[in-house]
Amino acid sequence: MSDSSKPHNSSPNNVPRLLSHATSSQESHDERVTAVKDNIIESGDHLGISVEEQLALLDAFSHLELGQFLLKHHGLNAHWTHNVIAHRPTHYINSLEEIIYTQLPNVLATRERFGIFQRLLQELLRPDAVMISVPCGVMADLLLLDYTRHRDVKLIGIDLDKQALEEAYKLASQQGLENQISLVLTDAWTIDLAVQADVITSNGLNVYEQDDDKVTELYRVFYSGLKPGGTLITSFMTPPPTLSQDSPWINTDPKLLALQYVLFSRIIGATWTAFRTHQKTQSQLEQAGFTDIQFINDHMHMYPTVIANKPF
């Protein structure tokens, strides 16, 4: 890597904890599976899915690489986030893996959200634009755009996970964009973007942060990093009907939602549960200073995209 593109840490003495997939558990895989089994038995049937069926789901899930990672970490890292979005297996280990990649509502909403981001970001490409992704993960949101007419764009990826930045650099090299990319290892809440960005794109961080004030503060960081007239493209996860009467979810299959609940809540213990409504998200963005806020829903209204602008 060149000096301008290799990851560097702007806060080496104070590295905050990864929200998405950090784990301090010393449990072995077998110990974790046993603990989940006990929880399933104690919790009982769920919406037509018997304890025996849930235990069979756990067994099938524990044989998948994705399943083993989620059982340990309870959230997705950069590699597995990109895998869920982009991977199209030609062979499935078992029927559960096929359901996860082709039918699970949250996965389909995530893929649709990614496609919406790609369309919007492509439209925002301009000569000499500075585009920032935070947290960038493998940075597919920016690195998979078409830069045929915009080879002068500057791309900046910011993440707290060193492995994510390494994978982002690999993808940049594959795309022939290694000379346009800069990577920074730091916490999203502490970055100083020096009012340099034309576009900031952010996905997958607010869903792990339960504190509304901290999320609003994150939006303030983004606002301060944008040039006047700059644009933020972000997203959020809406609450399911089981948690809120204000849930906007539509076009969902009840059986698949029940399966998803068992996987996420009883088996994985998922940490991406910081759900917010459209109204709450709009309020947070307005508090941060953004105007002209627009929402684009996926067809299930699970994972909306938000476009927000910094006024001139």
Q: What is each stretch, according to the model?
A:
Residues 61-126:
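Class I SAM-dependent methyltransferase Rossmann-like catalytic core
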Residues 137-152:
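Conserved SAM-binding loop of SAM-dependent methyltransferases across substrates and taxa
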Residues 168-169:
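Conserved SAM-binding loop
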Residues 189-200:
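A short acidic, Gly/Pro-enriched loop at the edge of an enzyme's catalytic core
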Residues 198-213:
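A short SAM/SAH-binding and catalytic strip from SAM-dependent methyltransferases
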Residues 233-288, 293-295:
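C-terminal alpha-helical "lid/dimerization" subdomain adjacent to the S-adenosyl-L-methionine
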